[in-house]
Amino acid sequence: MEEKNYATVESLTAQANEQYLKYMNEGRLRDILKVMGLMPDYTVMNDVLIMSQMPNVKLVKRLTGWNKDGRKVKEHQKSLKIISPCLKKYNQDYTDENGNVFTKGIEKLDLSVGHVFDISQTEGREYPYLNTNKETIAKFFEAAKNSLERTAKGYKFEYVDQEPFAKMDKENKVVYIKDGLSIDELINTLINQTTRVLIDSRRPEGITSKTVENIDDIEYNCALYAIKSKLGLNLPDFNDDAITNLSDEEKLEFKNNLQKVRSVSMQLLSNFETAIEIAIRGLDKQTQKVEEEVKAQEKTEEVKAPVEKKTAKKTSSKSKKVESEVE
């Protein structure tokens, strides 16, 4: 689907900054975080651009990506414009030791206007993308639990008899989890603790505690909101007045904090959903194997039945012959 493009990287950047400030001044940080959870591998700028063009976005891909999945873009659909990284070739002159000048092409990372489409703008083969929710997590609990524990690299988890759901010993890198929690309580607690480990492992970005005293807790809750909104879990309730009350210049600086939040969300969600997807595929293979074994058994019985019938007929004829000879 060809579409005339009048946007530039510069105009999209200006639009993204304008929309970002508009959302932040309207107190819509949580809306940005929700989109971030849906698309953790995109930048905050692109989250805002996509959000402004399609507020109810679910899942976006490039045209080639949808074609690969057996889906095509419906007629009269406009692409969602984003800022996309790309490799561009530049010619550069070199002079060798003999003074000869020659030109060599080199590739550099650059930015260009990209185009994506939401799944609602496409049609075709059913797209079995992973829709993680409480039911899926409960069904593949062990895979989910192990994924979260592995994501908190350097930490070990111990399940003990204690009153609080969790206690973290940062000095010895141990997370103590209350033994006997329900599946829902345990998964939420593990997500909370793993998110805290990941937030603490990142270097400071953007606004610091000099400007906002509890910035670490705000980053932590922002990451939890993005992660849990994607997974369909109960969302954290946190106070973001300190961010809403920042100046426009400081809010633009806060985008760097959100990039840190995005990095944490992407790492946890990628590991978590990959683990569950592998578990689902493993179950599908196991189910397929059982079905194939049942079909093979049924086929064997179908072949065996006529042989037994034929053998029984021969035995009956032989018995009659013997009876005749005796008479």
Where are these regions (language model features)?
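Arg/Lys-rich low-complexity patches in intrinsically disordered regions that function as generic
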Residues: 306-320
